[in-house]
Amino acid sequence: GGGRRHGIPVSWSETFIENDKAGLGALGDIGCYSIDLVMNALGNPKPLTVTGTATDYFGTTPEAYSQVGKPECAKKFSVDDFASAYIRLEGGIILDFRIAWYMHLDTPGDTIIMGTKGSLRIPSTDCWNGSFNKPMTIYHDVAGEPVETVVPLLPATTDLFDRKIRSFLNAVITGGEAPVPTSQIIYNQAILDGIQRSSDC
């Protein structure tokens, strides 16, 4: 998961906070990226079950908008500002997920992938463009001893956002395959939908 300490997006547009326009709040705005990161790292296993909750405790209070000077947004707020879920994936994989637009923490924590042969810690980031500002760490055993292997950050040789746009345009122009397979998008959206439906029960 991930999130923002005080980051309900209303400084330039209020469409993110209105259910009839956005459908989802933090869950759909930034939660999709957190889920995509983990699903991609795991090889995009099929989601089996989702149990989740989504709340609006902060977005409905005028205090949540004090930094942007828009207390009237509290009356318009009709989406989630926090969501959490327990997601079972194919292969016996369990995903514990949290995302927030507003919280009294700097982060709900790093992304941690735990396995039987080792674990991977992906540092939390405020950036949602697929880049990291801290190295990842692999926790594993070597010769029966627990060790930590830091995965160094490699400097980007090109602009990652530009590469994403160009790969999409190339697929459109040449009629080639989409850079992201449809199944990955469907799995991501199924998880988001499952969290919201579970919360509505």
Please state what every model-predicted region is.
Residues 28, 32-36, 159-166, 183-190:
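A structural signal for well-ordered alpha-helical segments within the folded catalytic domains
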